[in-house]
Amino acid sequence: LDVRDIADGVIYDEDGLRVTALHTSHMGHDAQYGWRAFGFSVEADGKKLVYTGDTGGYDDYAPLLENCDLLLHETGHHDPLAAARHLAESGRAPKRLGFIHHGRTILADPEGVQARLNTVDGISARILNDGETVEL
């Protein structure tokens, strides 16, 4: 096990697998430890997945969205409908959007939230369940 601090940029690039880190504003910057929350892109076999991590919002992960096949977006701190609409209107929408790390909005009414997500034009958004597999 090789544990190390990370910073923005490519943190792994071997055997056709590339992982890029980008700090988020979720926990801010600490003078001793630097950025304490990160989002990541994972690229392999011509596919790209972006994981927001705990995020302060769109501006935190937007630089990772180019050619994104699947964006895994946390909803513990964000409204999924607002996030889907913003992404659809941004001109940088991923091919697919999967919501994870669910907050109260989704936990209270997952079917209702999914029904509302289905009405957002310009993006394919789904609420994902723990343990669910998504093929790219």
Sequence positions of predicted segments:
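Active-site neighborhood of divalent metal-dependent phosphoester bond hydrolases
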Residues: 1-2, 107
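Core dinuclear metal-dependent hydrolase active-site scaffold
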Residues: 2-63, 130-136
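Cap/insert and terminal regions of metallo-dependent hydrolase folds
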Residues: 56-136
